[in-house]
Swiss-Prot record:
<dbReference type="InterPro" id="IPR042487">
    <property type="entry name" value="RuvBL1/2_DNA/RNA_bd_dom"/>
</dbReference>
<dbReference type="InterPro" id="IPR027417">
    <property type="entry name" value="P-loop_NTPase"/>
</dbReference>
<keyword id="KW-0067">ATP-binding</keyword>
<dbReference type="GO" id="GO:0097255">
    <property type="term" value="C:R2TP complex"/>
</dbReference>
<comment type="similarity">
    <text>Belongs to the RuvB family.</text>
</comment>
<comment type="function">
    <text>DNA helicase which participates in several chromatin remodeling complexes, including the SWR1 and the INO80 complexes. The SWR1 complex mediates the ATP-dependent exchange of histone H2A for the H2A variant H2A.Z leading to transcriptional regulation of selected genes by chromatin remodeling. The INO80 complex remodels chromatin by shifting nucleosomes and is involved in DNA repair. Also involved in pre-rRNA processing.</text>
</comment>
<dbReference type="GO" id="GO:0000812">
    <property type="term" value="C:Swr1 complex"/>
</dbReference>
<protein>
    <recommendedName>
        <fullName>RuvB-like helicase 2</fullName>
        <ecNumber>3.6.4.12</ecNumber>
    </recommendedName>
</protein>
<keyword id="KW-0547">Nucleotide-binding</keyword>
<keyword id="KW-0378">Hydrolase</keyword>
<keyword id="KW-0804">Transcription</keyword>
<dbReference type="InterPro" id="IPR010339">
    <property type="entry name" value="TIP49_P-loop"/>
</dbReference>
<keyword id="KW-0805">Transcription regulation</keyword>
<dbReference type="Pfam" id="PF06068">
    <property type="entry name" value="TIP49"/>
</dbReference>
<dbReference type="InterPro" id="IPR041048">
    <property type="entry name" value="RuvB-like_C"/>
</dbReference>
<keyword id="KW-0698">rRNA processing</keyword>
<keyword id="KW-0010">Activator</keyword>
Length: 481
């Protein structure tokens, strides 16, 4: 009996205005939804099965709301997919759970203190899901009557609206008439009116009026006439972050700062009042706290004061999940003379869970480069892909990935349809990888300005090869022919 073939379908969403970035091909963690077992290559991620499964377990706990105030460190050598793993988690969480990405060097600013920048990042990563009930009227417009006064008084009108079960007539004031005119509401339209705010939403047009016109616009949407009562109670859910509430309450017309980005320092008293109010909403059942994710890339760039602040912030009631990435080994903690694993203090390492990533195999490199070529819409020959895989194994995945675009430009110059080996070879000769660049620096050491300011301006280093001019002694120059 033949084994059953299981296929996994993946839809590729339209990118829109987003440019092709280093991780734009990642659309999730690529794990099975039920067993959390990672697939070999799925949703843009390849290999790193153990790390992806560990990330999937953390992700499942985040979705269930069972984990908050925890820290996870993704540690591994460069070009092993640490940031890609975090991006996969962000894509899997969706838009409802706040996900904030922060590079460790971003917190150093002259306009804002380090702790304020970290506080804002923490507050951006905590969502508040606010529930409110609104009374709406939804139905098909039968007739609109507008009476304009000759003497210039306010306009008055009547709106006849119906469902399949009932019909009613409402009096309209001048503001409602203006709103109807602005939305271009006419007989046959299906509309929704929020009674508390007076907002009118045009949902579509009734099927009964589909023959009124011979030609319709592409945005015309035909709907069935609503049934039941005209007036209904509807629960509306808004998800905002604590940082957005902070900004709005920090100054007059604070909501404008949300768009300009000029938030500045926010006083701790305002944050305390907001925390108290959110706690009241939570007790009354009006709001729900959504712990999000704060991702700090290159976390070893933080100094000892920042780690001390994060230690305290993780113990507070309103704390997100902090995911960090580091490619350092046993290195010095910034701001101290002490060395520690991953460049993090030992008391901070004691609080975190660590996920390790390993170097990719040649087969995994080939699959990643294939995905990148598809994302950048580059057609590679099998030999060119094999050469790029070899380059990636020896010079690094990032360098090989960058060669895809440059090889495509060289290929387009000779008006070929497929990127061949000669295109990759020419691109390899034009652009140096780190190893060849280091070799060039070593060979040209005397021609380059060193840390002591010594440089040789003579062609080929002269006869003796010794420096002829120095930064300190400008008068010592060899003028012999």
């Amino acid at each position: 009996m033949a084994a059953q073939v299981v296929t996994v379908g993946e839809s590729k969403d339209l990118r829109g205005l987003n440019l092709i970035a280093a991780h734009s091909h990642i659309r999730g963690l690529g794990v099975d939804a039920d067993t959390l077992e990672p697939r070999v290559a799925s949703q843009g991620l390849v290999g790193q099965e153990k790390a992806r499964k560990a990330a999937a377990v953390v992700l499942e706990m985040i979705k269930q709301g069972k984990i908050a105030g925890r820290a996870v460190l993704i540690a591994g050598p460069p070009s092993t997919g640490k940031t890609a793993l975090a991006m996969g988690m962000a894509q899997s969480l969706g838009t409802d759970v706040p996900f904030t990405t922060l590079a460790a060097s971003e917190i150093y600013s002259l306009e804002m203190s380090k702790t304020e920048a970290l506080t804002q990042a923490f507050r951006k990563s905590i969502g508040v899901r606010i529930k409110e009930e609104s009374e709406i009227m939804e139905g098909e417009v039968v007739e609109i009557q507008i009476d304009r006064s000759v003497t210039g008084h306010a306009k008055q009108g009547k709106l006849t609206i119906k469902t399949t079960d009932m019909e009613a007539i409402y009096d309209m004031g001048s503001k409602m008439i203006d709103a109807m005119t602005k939305e271009r509401v006419m007989a046959g339209d299906i509309i929704s009116i929020d009674k508390s705010s007076g907002k009118i939403t045009k949902l579509g047009r009734s099927y009964a009026r589909s023959r009124d016109y011979d030609a319709m616009g592409v945005d015309t949407k035909f709907l069935q006439c609503p049934d039941g009562e005209l007036q209904k109670r509807k629960e509306v859910v808004h998800t905002v972050t604590l940082h957005e509430i902070d900004v709005i309450n920090s100054r007059t017309q604070g909501f404008l700062a949300l768009f300009s980005g000029d938030t500045g320092e926010i006083r701790s008293e305002i944050r305390d009042q907001i925390n108290t109010k959110v706690a009241e909403w939570k007790e009354e059942g009006k709001a729900e706290i959504v712990p999000g994710v704060l991702f700090i890339d290159e976390v070893h760039m933080l100094d000892i004061e920042c780690f001390s602040y994060i230690n305290r912030a993780l113990e507070s009631d309103l704390a997100p999940i902090v995911i960090m990435a580091s490619n350092r080994g046993h290195s010095k903690i910034r701001g101290t003379d002490y060395k520690s694993p991953h460049g993090l203090p030992l008391d901070f390492l004691d609080r975190i869970s660590i996920i390790n990533t390993h170097s990719y195999t040649p087969d995994e490199l080939r699959q990643i480069l294939t995905i990148r070529a598809q994302e950048e819409e580059v057609d590679l020959t099998p030999d060119a892909l094999a050469l790029l895989t070899k380059i990636g194994a020896e010079a690094g995945l990032r360098y090989a990935s960058n060669l895809i675009t440059t090889s495509q430009l060289i290929c387009a110059k000779r008006k070929a349809k497929q990127v061949g080996v000669e295109d990759v070879q020419r691109s390899f000769k034009l652009f140096y990888d780190p190893a060849r660049s280091v070799k060039f620096v070593q060979e040209s050491e005397k021609r380059l300005i060193g840390s002591d300011g010594v440089v040789d301006f003579r062609v080929n280093g002269g006869a003796t090869g010794e420096p002829a001019a120095t930064a300190a002694g400008g008068d010592s120059m060899d003028t012999s022919s």
